[in-house]
Amino acid sequence: MLNGLDEGIRVQVSTTVSGAESPKLVLESVQNIFPDFTAGVLVEPKFGTSNNYQWENEQISLNNFNQMIHKQANLDTALYVMGMKLRNDKTSFQLLRQASIAQKIAFNLDAGNPLGGVINVELTGDNLADWLEAATWHKGRDTVPKRINDERKMDFDGEPSTWI
């Protein structure tokens, strides 16, 4: 299984803990997808106080993330979302923490900050498009080939642009 690090991909994962959010639950939601992710001291908010943390880790393995998108069979969605902002061998995307706390992968396609927050992921590396296609490959692509930004890509609102 491709993990990004062994293939020369720079992986940066970050999230924000704010307001009355529980740092423990936020960390759990991130670690459900990225088990190597670490955070500093976890101080639960008390009534009348709020949290404001920005957590960021670099060189995080994508192995568990890749296993999850394969198991949950959302490889084409993953390819399209991860490829939407691909420019000059760099891309970024967001995962919904509300889904990750339940050990599911769901991508944030909205520009705002949804209920439960997001996990920000940035990938940088030579031939990143090829790596994304390899990491999300499945047998169905033998019959219906797909590539980043092909005519079958989904629109920015998540709707399919064509049906087969």
Functional labels for PLM-detected ranges:
Residues T15-G19, F34, R97-I101, L123-N127:
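Beta-strand elements of well-folded, non-transmembrane domains
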Residues Q103-I164:
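Glycine-rich, aromatic-bearing surface loops/beta-hairpins
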Residues S29-F37, M68-L75, H138-R141:
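Conserved short hydrophobic interaction patches
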Residues L62-Q103:
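Ordered, amphipathic secondary-structure segments that act as subunit-interaction surfaces
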Residues M1-V41, P45:
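Long, hydrophobic N-terminal alpha-helical segment
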Residues I9-T16, R87-Q94, I119-V121:
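Short glycine-/aliphatic-rich beta-strand segments at the starts of folded cytosolic domains
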Residues G40-N63:
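Short, charge-patterned binding micro-sites
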